[in-house]
Amino acid sequence: MDATANQFAAGKHYKMDFEVDYRFRIPDEGYMIDDDGNIHIYNKTGLFGWNKIADEYRKATVTLEKEYIDEPAGDGIKVIDMGNELWEPISAFGGVFEGNGVTIRNLQIANKGFIATNTGTIRNLTLENVSFSADITEGAGSLAAESSTSVIQNCTVKGVTATVIKPVVFGGLIGRNSEGRIEGCQVISGTINLNLSGAGNSNYGGLVGEHFNGTALIIN
């Protein structure tokens, strides 16, 4: 039997040349969960995808995969542009969030912060052009409203805008830091409008609104 375009003769050997494409393809979901239960994020879609499953993976290591993230200005700065799409805060996080020097830009937060309560480690992350979609009536901070027994390292906020109308704790980076370590962090600019009504204690700060308990540290 002769070999045709669709057939091969029995008992004969044929040489076939073909290429295998081993290049990684970003999942449609924008994130991937590895065999250890850790989460790898590649874009805006991936961040919102993580938001939906974060309660199931509170202790996970979450990594912004810098190699695959856009560099819009060609200046070496990798950016995930959220386009001011509303972000509901991660309710609680106790793992490791590795920002890898990536900037999350145009982040519009519904309330509290990027994360509501953090007991984990957040590092090497920049938040740029942060806003709150509604007037603030409870404790809040751009990165986290509450950070306890945690580590915040090398994190920056470049521009935050908020209006506070109740006596609360508010910080440009962290609202309340309790028994946590904040190292190498900064808030470069922000506008906080105070239009308060009602009774209660208020604490506001450019970096941290309230910093308390004996082992809480702010370094550099």
PLM regions: where:
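Extracytoplasmic cysteine-anchoring/structural motifs
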Residues: M1-I26
